[in-house]
Swiss-Prot record:
Pfam families: BATS (PF06968), Radical_SAM (PF04055). It comes from Stenotrophomonas maltophilia (strain R551-3). GO terms for biological process: biotin biosynthetic process. It is an enzyme of class 2 (transferase). This is Biotin synthase. Transmembrane segments: none annotated. Its EC number is 2.8.1.6. [4Fe-4S] cluster binds at C55, C59, C62. Homodimer.
């Protein structure tokens, strides 16, 4: 019988999980995964930057911050037709969810109708919709919900006690407030963080504790591995031990058993073997395509080959224009013949 979903985890409990011998931790995580999901099914999503660069914030990892010299130039919000063309390509390539990211601190009210038109158009294609636009007011969240948005991404980024080492232009409470607005609007939440930014294991525990003790567990939990970009303050940071990354995936799966745990930014640099360990540990979602906002992602052909080697299949989903989920009725095609959320790190 599946264990009860908990929101009262304690730091020492999560620390004890992190500290388990690696084989024991993977065994426990895989067992929890099988209680709630088919371990051979992986959700496939595509992420598009609909407004790149020029962000006024100072997130130390982000090449889209205008204060850093990273070679990322500010661009205007894309036209709806161009976004829908990308969404059609993503669907043809096998994506079941289409995420749109904009490098804003928060959208202006005048931006919402433009984004709403993108959302409605993508939903009409039969794709799940996700957006990451920065901080939202309650009214903005409701407007996006009315347009047909399914998921909103807003990451916590790191543990509360490490946050001030990474970001100074937005408070941790600001992030929690946006998540509350998103939940109150009836949107599903996509919320995770980034590891490999110089934090300690105890602070990685702190990030997962913050996520697992939210009023509702995020529907999707993206775990990003820092992509170091020249010009950002975190460029040159020590690399995170790959096994530590797998531990992060495994503990996320155990404490948030019904959430989709997504391999997000940093996957381009991961070996097939490391990704396979992550799938065993409970990861069941990836971003598919060659770019995540402004950073690389594995080439589609590499993903196809890895899925074939591991016997994995894309998760089946079909969403109609009214937002009804008909999971299991249509299988996405990511065969090699198929045509080919915001900051640098994935939604």
């Amino acid at each position: 019988m599946a264990a009860a979903i908990r929101h009262d985890w304690q730091h020492d409990e999560l620390q004890a999980l992190f500290d388990l011998p690696f084989p024991e931790l993977l065994f426990r995580a895989a067992a929890v995964h099988r209680e709630h999901f088919d371990p051979a099914q992986v959700q496939v999503s595509t992420l598009l930057s609909v407004k790149t660069g020029g962000c006024p914030e100072d997130c130390a990892y982000c090449p889209q911050a205008q204060r850093y010299n990273t070679g990322v130039n500010a661009q205007k919000l894309m036209e709806t037709d161009a976004v829908l063309a990308k969404a059609r390509q993503a669907k043809a390539a096998g994506a079941s969810r289409f995420c749109m990211g904009a490098a804003w601190r928060s959208p202006k009210d005048r931006d919402i109708p433009k984004v709403a038109a993108m959302i409605a158009g993508v939903k009409a294609l039969g794709l799940e919709t996700c957006a990451t636009l920065g901080m939202l007011s309650g009214g903005q969240a409701r407007a996006l919900k009315d347009a047909g948005l399914d998921y909103y991404n807003h990451n916590l980024d790191t543990a509360p006690d490490y946050y001030d080492s990474i970001i100074h232009t937005r408070q941790y409470q600001d992030r929690l407030d946006t998540l509350e607005h998103v939940r109150d609007a009836g949107l599903k939440t996509c919320c995770g963080g980034i590891v490999g930014m110089g934090e300690t294991r105890a602070q990685r525990v702190g990030l997962l504790l913050a996520l697992a003790t939210l009023p509702a567990h995020p529907d999707s939990v993206p775990i990003n591995k820092l992509v170091q970009v020249a010009g950002t303050p975190l460029h040159g940071s020590a690399e995170l031990d790959p096994f530590e990354f797998v531990r992060m995936i495994a503990v996320a799966r155990i404490v948030m058993p019904r959430s989709m745990v997504r391999l997000s930014a940093g996957r381009e640099a991961m070996s097939d073997e490391l990704q396979a360990l992550c799938f065993v540990a409970g990861a069941n979602s990836i971003f598919y395509g060659d770019k995540l906002l402004t950073t690389g992602n594995p080439e589609s052909e590499r993903d196809l080959a890895l899925f074939a080697r591991l016997g994995l299949q894309p998760m089946a989903v079909q969403v109609d224009a009214e937002g009804h989920d008909h999971g299991g009725t249509v299988h996405a095609d990511i065969s090699a013949d198929a045509p080919g959320c915001g900051c640098a790190h994935a939604a």
